[in-house]
Each structure stands twice: as structure tokens, then as C-alpha cells.
Curated annotation (Swiss-Prot):
Subunit structure, as described in the record: Part of the Bam complex, which is composed of the outer membrane protein BamA, and four lipoproteins BamB, BamC, BamD and BamE.
Organism: Yersinia pestis
Lineage: Bacteria, Pseudomonadati, Pseudomonadota, Gammaproteobacteria, Enterobacterales
Function: Part of the outer membrane protein assembly complex, which is involved in assembly and insertion of beta-barrel proteins into the outer membrane.
A single GO cellular-component term on record: cell outer membrane
Name under which the protein is recorded: Outer membrane protein assembly factor BamB
Amino acid sequence: MQLRKTLLVGLVSVALLSGCSLFNSEEDVVTMSPLPKVENQFSPTKVWSTSVGSGVGDYYSHLRPAWQGTSVFAADRKGLVKAMDADTGKQIWQTDLSEKTNFLSSNHSAMLSGGVTASGSHVYVGSEKAVVYALNAYDGQVAWQTVVAGEALSRPVVSDGVVLIHTSNGMLQALNESDGAIKWTLNLDTPALSLRGESAPAVAFGAAIVGGDNGRVSAVMMEQGQLIWQQRISQVTGATEIDRLNDIDITPVVVDGVVYALAYNGNLTALDLRSGQILWKREIGSVNDFIVDAGRIYLVDQNDRIIALKSDGGVTLWSQSDLLHRNLTAPVMYNGYLVVGDAEGYLHWVNTDDGRFVAQQSVDSSGFLSAPVVASDKLLIQARSGTVYAFTR
């Protein structure tokens, strides 16, 4: 089993108590698959690239660009937020959210980790310091900032006048979109040991659908923060603490009244949106967001297999195993192809019909952590180094 995510501080505490073993002593050490040889059927064109601060480095900060209208917004971990022209990559504005100290010392990192989200007149980003920022989309000035219940590790989600934040300690909070005031807080319960990351909510018909570290999917009324239903899709099993992790750190997908959810050590599950009743499930685990499109589900599992399944019943259509343990990003659909990045900075383009590679390109040696983003006719991706790239096909 490949441990894909940094664990919470609680993991270290558990390991120290009573000499507790986190890993099975017989567990194999995984090795990254060699780069597969691909005969490119086309060559994606790099339109522009631009640096955004120092990126995320070796930290597990899931920052990725956001696109709205003619602008692209991106951030680095230290606190630099930048707006760029979507066609050229030229800077429109930049804002530094790092904490100012005296003139002899460098600024303290803002530790940005959740975002970036662009919606309406604001750009939103959250931090490990439990602060959510709203910046004016047109000039980058801070419109408001709010201290939330815990680390904001997932991207803010904006809908129906509220900004939804899922914090690292299992709190789902709704902030007023205009001024950041907290409207309600709901405790979704977090076990002592969990993966470092949280599911960003999906929104449908006035409800927020969110996965929790307790292996449950919850539906919450956005207006009042009232729980509608809760369904467990991942059970605590296994001999080691790692095997018993059952987080749902992936954003659910809602299509035609069905909620699709995916857990780390659990199942790919389809649930009825109205009742939460389980319609079907498959034993597949992941830490990456997935796609539901045209009757198919596309995902990257915890061992970096790329898998296509039928959305009605979960039957496997194909599986691509040539990128095992290359620490793939979540997939995106772009111009009819699946695209994933990997830890060595390659982009892999995959045929959706059979899972075969159609193109491969080396982009940035610092590697990719966060998924690509589709921005109209362009594909955007941000490397660990902070550089944002725009490609066309």
C-alpha cells in the first residue's frame, strides 16, 4: 500500500504511545514505475508559463490555479496571490498575504493550503493558520478575512451566497460571501488518526455533500447547516493504523440525483441524493478527485492505476497500470482526453476509450501535486516550484 498523503500530527502521537506500530513490518516498500515509452500522436503546445512565488515546495499544500472570465488566479504557500491574463499569462495584480514583521526579518509564511477559488467579485484561499481570505478579483485587495474553526486544507466552495469551508478538525462552516461572517458550524466528527486533507463539498439543490474523516458522507442543508442524512461508505478494518484509515478526502460528484463518493481505504460508492441510500459500491480506494462524464467514472486509485468504470453499477471498462506509484494528480478531461500529472513533472494524455497513452511531455522537474485545470480552450497546471503552465491541444 502506498501512503499518498502526509498524516496529521495525531499520527505521530499515536506512534509514540505504547510503542504502537503504524506499519506492518512485512509491508513491501513500493517503487515508482519507470516512465513508459509513448509514441506521441500529437504535441501539446505550451502557450505561456509564469512564476507564482516559490510554490509549495515539499509541503502538501493543494494549491491550484482558478480561472474566471479572462483571468487566471494562483497562489504560493508563503502568501503570494497573483492574477494573470488567461491568454498571455501577463500579471494583472499580485497581493502578498504573508505576515509582516520588522524590517530586519523576513515575513512569516501565510501557509496557504486551500484553494484557489474564483467566484463572482472575489478570489478565495484558505490557510493552515485557520484563516480564509477573500480578495477583490479586480485588484487583489483583501475584502475580508475570517478565522475559522481549524486549518483550511481544502478549497473554499461558493454557492447560494455562502462560502463553505471544511476544516482539518472536521468542522463544516458557512461564511457569508459578502463579509465573511460565520453563519453556521457543523461538527462532522474526526477520528484521532486521519490523513492530512479534507473533502471540499459538492453542492446540489441547496445541499452541501461532503466526505468526512470518519468514513461517512453527509448531506447538509446550506441555509441552516442542518444534517439531512449521513451514510458510511468506509469501514475501519486492517491490522495496522494505516490500514484502518477510512478518510473521504475527495470531493463527491453529484450527477442526475446520484452522489458518487470515494474513500481512501474504502469503496467507490453511489448513493441516492435524496435519502443517502447506497445504490452500489466497488472496493476501490483513492485520495484523488475523480470524474463522472457521459456514463463513465474516471479515477486514479491509491496505487496510481487509472481506471474507467460504468457510472451505472461500477463495472470496470479498462485499467491503465503503467504509471504505478508515480504519485499521480487527479485526472481532468480536456478535449476528449484524460490528463494527469506526476511527481516527476510529466503530463500524461490518455485515450478515454481504452486507456492507452496518446501523448507524454516533460514539463517541470519539481513535479506536480495538484490536478490540472481546464480554462476554456487551455489546460493549466501549477508545479511544486510555483510555475503555472498553460497548454493547448
